[in-house]
Curated annotation (Swiss-Prot):
Organism ancestry: Bacteria, Pseudomonadati, Pseudomonadota, Gammaproteobacteria, Enterobacterales
HAMAP family cross-referenced by the UniProt entry: Rsd
Source organism: Yersinia enterocolitica serotype O:8 / biotype 1B (strain NCTC 13174 / 8081)
Protein family according to the UniProt entry: Belongs to the Rsd/AlgQ family.
GO biological process, one term: regulation of DNA-templated transcription
Keywords tagged on the record: Cytoplasm, Transcription, Transcription regulation
Protein known as: Regulator of sigma D
Subunit structure: Interacts with RpoD.
Primary gene name: rsd
Major location (coarse): cytoplasm
Presence of the UniProt keyword Cytoplasm in the record: yes
Subcellular location: Cytoplasm
Length: 167
């Protein structure tokens, strides 16, 4: 996921401040996810995992989801498409998929926020981390479609400079 993010950032980075901020927030989320998945339980019975790392990940997760749903998606769609765009049908497919994905991710958040992970629940938690990684990957692929559409739209809207003339 980090490699794909780096590639996307190289392709579209700098084209729009909103996209740059969004990609930066995604990177922060991925770093916090990587921190959580790297945590292993101690051998002692009932030794909790690093709750601070889990708390940080859950905080970044909610911030990322909220900014997408309440700020970024609508702005991108309005800037890129308008109500009569031929791509509107595509976003009517992507947005519901993102909404369903959000429900899956929030179920993880609700389940594992404010819970102590001990040896008895460690296996279940590790599976949940794997599942949330897959959900994030699916989400990022959907969001990448929106970002790509936005980048293409903004690129097409820029004037073409050829031999000192603006066309």
């Amino acid at each position: 996921m980090l490699n794909r993010l780096e590639s996307l950032t190289q392709r579209v980075g700098g084209s729009n401040e909103l996209i740059d901020q969004w990609l930066h927030a995604r990177k922060e989320l991925l770093v916090s996810y990587c921190t959580v998945i790297g945590i292993k339980p101690q051998k002692g019975k009932h030794t909790p995992l690093n709750e601070k790392a889990l708390e940080n990940f859950c905080h970044n997760l909610v911030d990322y989801l909220s900014s997408g749903h309440f700020h970024i998606y609508d702005r991108i769609i309005k800037q890129v498409e308008g109500a009569s765009s031929p791509k509107m049908a595509l976003t009517t497919k992507v947005y519901p998929a993102l909404k369903n994905n959000t429900q899956t991710i929030m179920a993880f958040h609700d389940r594992y926020t404010n819970i102590e992970i001990d040896d008895d629940s460690c296996t279940e938690f590790q599976q949940a981390l794997s599942d949330i990684g897959e959900a994030l990957d699916a989400r990022f692929r959907l969001e990448d479609q929106l970002i790509q559409w936005a980048a293409e739209s903004w690129q097409a809207a820029k004037p073409v400079i050829q031999a000192g003339q603006v066309k």
